[in-house]
Swiss-Prot record:
Pfam family, one: Formyl_trans_C
Function: Methionyl-tRNA formyltransferase that formylates methionyl-tRNA in mitochondria and is crucial for translation initiation.
E.C. no: 2.1.2.9
BP GO terms, sorted: conversion of methionyl-tRNA to N-formyl-methionyl-tRNA
Disulfide bonds: none
Keyword Ribosomal protein: no
Phylogenetic classification of the source organism: Eukaryota, Metazoa, Chordata, Craniata, Vertebrata
Organism this protein belongs to: Mus musculus
Keyword Transit peptide applies: yes
Protein name: Methionyl-tRNA formyltransferase, mitochondrial
NCBIfam families documented for this protein: fmt
Catalytic activity: L-methionyl-tRNA(fMet) + (6R)-10-formyltetrahydrofolate = N-formyl-L-methionyl-tRNA(fMet) + (6S)-5,6,7,8-tetrahydrofolate + H(+)
Keywords tagged on the record: Mitochondrion, Protein biosynthesis, Transferase, Transit peptide
Primary subcellular site in the record, as a coarse category: mitochondrion
Any one cellular-component term (Gene Ontology): mitochondrion
Amino acid sequence: MLLPRCCWGRWLMGRRPRCSCQAPAGFDGKDGRGSRVREKPPWRVLFLGTDHFARETLRALHAARDGKEEKLIEKLEVVTVPSLSPKGLPVKQYAIQSQLPVYEWPDVGSGEYDVGVVASFGRLLSEALILKFPYGILNVHPSCLPRWRGPAPIIHTVLHGDTVTGVTIMQIRPKRFDIGPILQQETIPVPPKSTSKELEAVLSKLGANMLISVLKNLPESLNNGRPQPAEGVTYAPKVSAGTSCVKWEEQTSEQVLRLHLAIGDIVPLQTLWMENTVKLLDLVEVNNSILADPKLTGQTVTPGFVVYHRPSQMLLVRCKDGWIGVRSVMLKKTLTATDFYNGYLHAWYQKNSHAHPSQCRFQTLRLPTKMQQKTKLLLCNSALSS
């Protein structure tokens, strides 16, 4: 079990900083529409989200609404975004199955709420919308802010080889993403060789539990909110489809493997074999016993050089430094490494018997700029749900 710990130490102990959030009520204890502001649960909540990460948060809110022991949520309604899928995004699917009222952005309904909750929503919220909620809008963000602000924090956590990550519950500010005060923050170690999808599953449960904890003591949590540090700010922009094209001459074997772990569940890494696009489906680290093979030592080979290693039944591809193993690929159909050798590599060697072996290589696939913009398969957290 991964045990979370506080990201920010004990500096806040014994202190009760001035609340940097929107005041929960006017002097008369009423919100802008004349309704009396609640000072304790149960809360009326509007949830805005899209993907599997967000669905876990919605599930926790739903369970809190229907809880018999302690009534934390009185009212729960949902906002999601349009989807090309007929079934809709995971949040919409869950809302419909659970018979929760659901709206499609920019429609947010016309009901009265105490607090808004956002998770993986990907839309900037206006100040006018934020001010409709007496307690503002909370964001469940899967990173330790201010590291990895933006729409793809989990992907960038894996892509950059972070060993520690976490979840931040923050209060939203208008006009910019992920800059508001931190209400709660916890860290966990990143499991070795974890994919973005696997890490998302861990963080989604942590974030859902943290949100429920904040809602149980909402006024106090808001009052104890702290500004994000000015140091350590990094950004997690969406990742374009072109990122999936392996640059053998520029990327190390570790970088290629991290790229596969980060986006391989969403879009496979791609390369070029004799002018044909090849998708690399199953990439693995090459162990020392394989690297000791005489075929791989004592000769200089060009990055992209590919050879079939019969004992391990893998394709071995040379990177900028070192080798990466490939167990399966896709051309017109999915092929094992052995299938690829029998159907393509062996035929190349027969046809080019006098060529230097280093000419048998994968080359970097370069997508036209227009194609990248057209497909704009921009990868963010919500893409993990597709």
